[in-house]
Amino acid sequence: MKKQGVLIAPSIMGADLACLGDAARNIEESGANLIHIDVMDGHFVPNITFGPGIIAAINRSTDLFLEVHAMIYTPFEFVEAFVKAGADRIIVHFEAAENLKEILDYIRKCGVQAGIAFSPETSIEFISAFIPLCDVILLMSVQPGFCGQKFIPDTIEKIRFVRQAIQTLGKEGSCLIEVDGGIDEESARACREAGADILVAASYFFKKDSINMKEKVLLLQGEEHGAK
């Protein structure tokens, strides 16, 4: 995926689940860059969402890049199914997976991008060891599992830390920083300024208000106000 400024990834988890095809098409028409699909197993997080069948249905409804955020235990078992369903990138959780290096390598061998997600309470002091193995590092800015939570301010310092690590390793452009949760205009601005590359939002895009989705994409990108 070619990066042009901050990338916007609406999480389809926030949509009306009876109308996912329409939601995917609306996301594409809004000018967003990709669709974020939260897969939850009811064990790693206390919620259950989508599986490979739903991913395949979304894939049939859009040409956008599909990113699967696997909030599940034993993600290795589902990689092939996610790829066959149309995933372009698979992100696994540091806290949920054993043998992370093997999983990341396997994901890439399957022909798609790979990433690691970190929950808010997880230390990222060791992040440099994983950056060369990833296309994206996802920082959870809320507790994983549910929409509608408030942005955790400590995430901003984590973004700066990961950005510095990427620069030190000479991996600018090859490993992106993604922030997921509690994203609105204010938190998006702080994330952009700290060095985030991708912003994921669910409730922000799908709540009922007077701002259409295309305008919301522009607001998160900062384009309406000439921001970074």
Curated annotation (Swiss-Prot):
A divalent metal cation binds at residues 36, 38, 69, 180. Its EC number is 5.1.3.1. It catalyses: D-ribulose 5-phosphate = D-xylulose 5-phosphate. Its cofactor is a divalent metal cation. It holds the Pfam family Ribul_P_3_epim. Binds 1 divalent metal cation per subunit. InterPro entries: Aldolase_TIM, Ribul_P_3_epim, Ribul_P_3_epim-like, RibuloseP-bd_barrel. The active site is at 38 (proton acceptor), 180 (proton donor). Keywords: Carbohydrate metabolism, Isomerase, Metal-binding. It is an enzyme of class 5 (isomerase). Disulfide bonds: none annotated. One of its GO terms (biological process) is pentose-phosphate shunt. Substrate binds at residues 11, 69, 145-148, 180-182, 202-203. GO terms for molecular function: D-ribulose-phosphate 3-epimerase activity; metal ion binding. Pathway: Carbohydrate degradation. PANTHER family: RIBULOSE-5-PHOSPHATE-3-EPIMERASE. Belongs to the ribulose-phosphate 3-epimerase family. Catalyzes the reversible epimerization of D-ribulose 5-phosphate to D-xylulose 5-phosphate. This is Ribulose-phosphate 3-epimerase. It comes from Chlamydia muridarum (strain MoPn / Nigg).
